[in-house]
Amino acid sequence: MDGALYSWFLSRGLIDRFRADLPKFLDAYRQEEPEEFYEVFGADCPDVSLKYLKLFYELPLNYVEDPKYLITGDMIFHERVIGWFRQAWLGDGTYFDDWFVIE
């Protein structure tokens, strides 16, 4: 990703907003169970969206006893994939870890 786009992305705090909004998207996904789930990020960033793929598969973390789930998807800017994200959650809904990669 070029420096200007990367700076724009970070200057709006989008990584933190992704983290904050994911539980809401999780609830919507649980109710709809689509193959893919799109979410436009917000009125101030209409060209940024999330595309969720293959949600809720087990994450093999041998040192944790609870069921684990991994959310994975693409970060899209002007209809172009600019990166990906993954978040790990325990079966009871407790946040575990995340990865955000801007390419």
Regions found by a protein language model. Give the residues of each.
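A short, surface-exposed interaction/processing loop segment used at functional sites
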Residues: 81-103
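A general, composition-driven signal for non-globular sequence regions
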Residues: 38, 48, 91-93
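N-terminal trafficking/processing presequences and adjacent post-cleavage segments
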Residues: 1-39
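A broad structural signal for short, well-ordered beta-strand segments within beta-sheet-rich domains
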Residues: 32, 50-52, 95
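Exposed beta-strand-loop-beta-strand "reactive/processing" segments of non-cytosolic proteins
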Residues: 43-87
